[in-house]
Amino acid sequence: HYREVYDLLGADYIIDESNEQRLTSVKRVGDKVSYHNDGIVRWGGAFSQIEYSNGMLSAFFNLSASNSGYKRIDYFKKRDLVLSDTTYREALGTSVTTNLIFDDQGNLVGANKTQVLDTIVHNGVAYTMNSDEAKLAETNWKNIPGFTIKTGANYNLDDKNNVFLNLGYLSKAPRFNNVYDYSNRLYRDIKNESVSALELGYSFRSSVFSSNLNMYYTIWNNKPSNGGITVTIDDIPFRANINGMDALHKGIELDLSCKLLSNLSLEGLLSIGDWRWTSTETVRFYDDDNSIALDPNSGDTIEVSFDADGVRVGDAAQTQLGFSLRYEPTTVSYVKLRYTFFDDYFADFDPISLGGENGGRDSWQIPSYDLIDLHCGYNFKLNQKNKLSLRLSILNLFDKIYISDAQNNDPYNDVSYQDFDAKSASVFFGLGRRFTMSARLNF
């Protein structure tokens, strides 16, 4: 992860002092600025499943386990000095010395800044960031286990109709952004997310028509906001997770396929969701001695209160409607037109911002939009064994302008508002018309 200078907009250089190992603050095109770090994820798991079937009834039971390992390496922080008998954390890089310049009357008229290498003397030996013992600032591995339990059954009512039921529980390791902060420190209060899910459905199959209808009910507990918050404990700033943030996802989904003619088919989908946060909490923090953390300035208990009960979950359209029409003029060609409509789409937001008079308030609702895509293909039979398939797609056929993503009350806007409306949000516009082409050779 890094930022890179790619356009100086007519300037000769920029000044950036974020790299604590820099030999110069002057940066030009191609130089990395602001931050430069790697997040490394090591994942392992085990899977087991038992299945049963007697023709009419089939069932399964699944049990899996996982381990997520996280490590962070920062290339801009001072290096660690790793010796046989001790380690100095983030100790060796460069520092700036400033020499003030005064005139004959003692007035300050300027200053000279000089980059110097940090030096540590240990047992009579001097070390700098260029020493072999100076290592990149990196964390230890943080391993977080998780597991999944799933079970389900399907019953065939007859040759065309069946019903099914699925149950599951998931203990999920948090995201990397909720494990290590930008200072290579572990978050406070790292806990797994837990997901309990129920799905009930019905399917129909025939030679000309098929459909699937399913209903879902998912309880998502301990879903921390991405990046957490900053708290100061014992005069040290920490990033902390806000645990106890729960959400309920429920909805209904339908997909169908109908063969209108031998060379003309229709497909459709409908998804209607009702996803809401269900939490109203006051969260307190604890220090390493398990004592309640106090504000170093006021002495008050460090706590965060929020009211997100009933607030719509953001960052995904909760209603989708779509259909496609596929026509095959010959046995080796096809044309497919696809339409999709998106609605009930709310800007992403931080639930812990819902305090005081903003408690229980929905984020800004992104305007609904629809997209049309065109796909076509042709198969060439080169010989008895070889076949060439060509595909062409035109996505967003009519070059629709729409908002594909938004952040509610974004504090990084040039002018920041907290009014839960369009002017308070930052947005990403969706991609315009674009073409893709592919070729596949079977031999």
What are these regions (language model features)?
Residues 1, 61-67, 165-169, 213-217, ...:
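Transmembrane beta-barrel strands of outer-membrane/channel proteins
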Residues 2-32, 70-140, 177-186, 225-240, ...:
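Solvent-exposed loop segments that connect transmembrane elements
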Residues 46-52, 151-155, 200-204, 215, ...:
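Residues on the lipid-exposed face of transmembrane beta-strands in outer-membrane beta-barrel proteins
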Residues 53-57, 67-68, 75, 217-219, ...:
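Gram-negative outer-membrane beta-barrel transporters
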Residues 56-59, 160-163, 208-211, 263-266, ...:
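Repeated loop/turn-to-beta-strand initiation elements of outer-membrane beta-barrel proteins
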Residues 221, 266, 341-353, 378-443:
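C-terminal beta-signal and adjacent terminal beta-strands/loops
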Residues 314-384, 398, 406-407:
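C-terminal beta-barrel architecture of Gram-negative outer-membrane proteins
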